[in-house]
């Protein structure tokens, strides 16, 4: 809907002109006193027709007919009687054919008569662009399944100046929800106009209202609501049947898949009951992408204390008669062996040595760093029980072998208490050599076999004399004759395996020789 291009321009011009004419020229006709207004006028555009309506303030006055007169303020003319509104009984008058210009100011006079007597006369000035209100047009609605057709009725011929700057608004209401539709109208508002409101819900009640909205945001007059209930969709039955068919199809497909899986499992193609290794166990496969964090390890503070201890070299000289404080250091051969000089003692002295090692306080082993104290050990008497038992026959020794005075855990120990040491010697790994004169001179205590060594004499066979000096070889043990230039040397690192092959050794009952 288009507004006349000159409407806004002439609006202010006509207002100024109207004031000027009223002040200078006045009104050229005689009229009664209108100081006491008794009428209320209203100009409106009803279905694009300019309709002037009035109402009397004093309801006690009841005229029988009315006569309407008007003049244009910009023209010095007398009042003219509106032909279709002379001696009318209606309280309104159609001025569409009389008031064609919207930019003019009109002066109207209304006279009320009762017979030939004038009851009242009132006047009012109108500016159509300002004083005119816009009533909604007539319309009809037709409801369908999901849309509504709105048909707006306009007059066949509408003056362009009466269209002003108007827009058509169609308002849709449903369940408290209001939607506005502003259709675009091309050209003049003439004839019937149809608008379709679509995307509606079937079987739902909708109400429609139509009105005209001015650009000046004047108060609008809405038409009464016209409601319609949309019929239910005709495709509802087919849609329900389609849903039922889809449900049945899905059920049949699920039944076929289930029966196929059960058959394959019964035949043995799937779900075999073979125990798989733990690596192929996929029961917790879903938990693999999110593994649990390993438990935290317990941490304790440890203080490391380094203690440097010097390795002691013990004197393996078992000669009790030597009281010298000097010690003979072990000698190392070129082959990597450690040589220790051993002095073979009589049986009585060997037994005494074993007894003395047992009498030593065990606390001396636990505190090797303490200074050593020379302890004078008692000597074993000649006729000790160990001697008597060793002097018995071979058969008696086999029946009651001597008990090892040292526990098994001491065999691997290289340190003894009181500056003495007890170790086992493997005769297969013992190397014997005769010391030269230079070697004998270097040693502080010569390891030569004494000619005064006691000999073991069997009372039954006095001719059988065994010497206490034994030499070990790789094949076994054999007695040797005492010689001033010969010494017996053994290695201290290897255990003994064949010490029980010779009867001349001191048999302890477990295959080792006590030295």
From Swiss-Prot:
GO CC field: extracellular region; extracellular space; plasma membrane; receptor complex
Effect annotated for changing residue 73 to V: No effect on activation of STAT1 upon IFNA2 or IFNG binding
Phenotype for residue 337 to F: Does not inhibit STAT1, STAT2 and STAT3 activation by IFN. Inhibits STAT1, STAT2 and STAT3 activation by IFN. Does not inhibit STAT1, STAT2 and STAT3 activation by IFN. Does not inhibit STAT1, STAT2 and STAT3 activation by IFN
Effect of residue 306 to F: Does not inhibit STAT1, STAT2 and STAT3 activation by IFN. Inhibits STAT1, STAT2 and STAT3 activation by IFN. Inhibits STAT1, STAT2 and STAT3 activation by IFN. Does not inhibit STAT1, STAT2 and STAT3 activation by IFN
One GO molecular-function entry: protein kinase binding
Result when mutating residue 295 to L: No effect on activation of STAT1 upon IFNA2 or IFNG binding
Extracellular side: 27-243
Chain positions carrying an annotated carbohydrate: 58, 87, 116, 188, 192
Modified residues (Phosphoserine): 400, 467
Task performed by this protein: Together with IFNAR1, forms the heterodimeric receptor for type I interferons (including interferons alpha, beta, epsilon, omega and kappa). Type I interferon binding activates the JAK-STAT signaling cascade, resulting in transcriptional activation or repression of interferon-regulated genes that encode the effectors of the interferon response. Mechanistically, type I interferon-binding brings the IFNAR1 and IFNAR2 subunits into close proximity with one another, driving their associated Janus kinases (JAKs) (TYK2 bound to IFNAR1 and JAK1 bound to IFNAR2) to cross-phosphorylate one another.
Protein name per its UniProtKB record: Interferon alpha/beta receptor 2
């Amino acid at each position: 809907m288009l507004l006349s291009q000159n409407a806004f321009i002439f609006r202010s011009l006509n207002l100024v002109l109207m004031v000027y004419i009223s002040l200078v020229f006045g009104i050229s006709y005689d009229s009664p006193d209108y100081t006491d207004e008794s009428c209320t006028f209203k100009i409106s555009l009803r279905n694009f027709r300019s309709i002037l309506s009035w109402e009397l303030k004093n309801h006690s006055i009841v005229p029988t007919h009315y006569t309407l007169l008007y003049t244009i303020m910009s023209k010095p003319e007398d009042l003219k009687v509106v032909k279709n509104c002379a001696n009318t009984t209606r309280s309104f008058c159609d001025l569409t054919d009389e008031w064609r210009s919207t930019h003019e100011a009109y002066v109207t006079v209304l006279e009320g008569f009762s017979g030939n007597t004038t009851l009242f006369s009132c006047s009012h000035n109108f500016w159509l662009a300002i004083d005119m209100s816009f009533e909604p047009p007539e319309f009809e609605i037709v409801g369908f399944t999901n849309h509504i057709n709105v048909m707006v009725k306009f007059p066949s011929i509408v003056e362009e100046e009466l269209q002003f700057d108007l827009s058509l608004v169609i308002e849709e209401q449903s369940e408290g929800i209001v939607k506005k539709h502003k259709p675009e109208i091309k050209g003049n508002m003439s004839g019937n106009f149809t608008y379709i409101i679509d995307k509606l819900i079937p079987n739902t009640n909708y109400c429609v209202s139509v009105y005209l909205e001015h650009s000046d945001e004047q108060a609008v007059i809405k038409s009464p609501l016209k409601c319609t209930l949309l019929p239910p969709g005709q495709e509802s039955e087919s849609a329900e049947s389609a849903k039922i068919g889809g449900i049945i199809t899905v059920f049949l497909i699920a039944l076929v898949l289930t029966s196929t899986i059960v058959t394959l499992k019964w035949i043995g193609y799937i779900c075999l009951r073979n125990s798989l290794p733990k690596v192929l166990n996929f029961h917790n496969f879903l938990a693999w992408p999110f593994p649990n964090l390993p438990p935290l390890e317990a941490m304790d503070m440890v203080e490391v204390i380094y203690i440097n201890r010097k390795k002691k070299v013990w004197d393996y000289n078992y000669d009790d008669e030597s009281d010298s404080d000097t010690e003979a250091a072990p000698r190392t051969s070129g082959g990597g062996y450690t040589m220790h000089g051993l002095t073979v003692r009589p049986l009585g002295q060997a037994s005494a040595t074993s007894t003395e090692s047992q009498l030593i306080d065990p606390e001396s082993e636990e505190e090797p760093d303490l200074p050593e104290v020379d302890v004078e050990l008692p000597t074993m008497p000649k006729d000790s029980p160990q001697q008597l038992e060793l002097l018995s026959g071979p058969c008696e020794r086999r029946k009651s072998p001597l008990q090892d005075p040292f526990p098994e855990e001491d065999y691997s120990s290289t340190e003894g208490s009181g500056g003495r040491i007890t170790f086992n010697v493997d005769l297969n790994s013992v190397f014997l050599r005769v010391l030269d004169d230079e070697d004998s001179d270097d040693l502080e205590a010569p390891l030569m076999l004494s000619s005064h060594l006691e000999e073991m004499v069997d009372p039954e066979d006095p001719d059988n004399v065994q010497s206490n000096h034994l030499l070990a070889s790789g094949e076994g043990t054999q007695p040797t004759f005492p010689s001033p230039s010969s010494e017996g040397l053994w290695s201290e690192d290897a255990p003994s395996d064949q010490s029980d092959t010779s009867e001349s050794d001191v048999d302890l009952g477990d295959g080792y020789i006590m030295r």
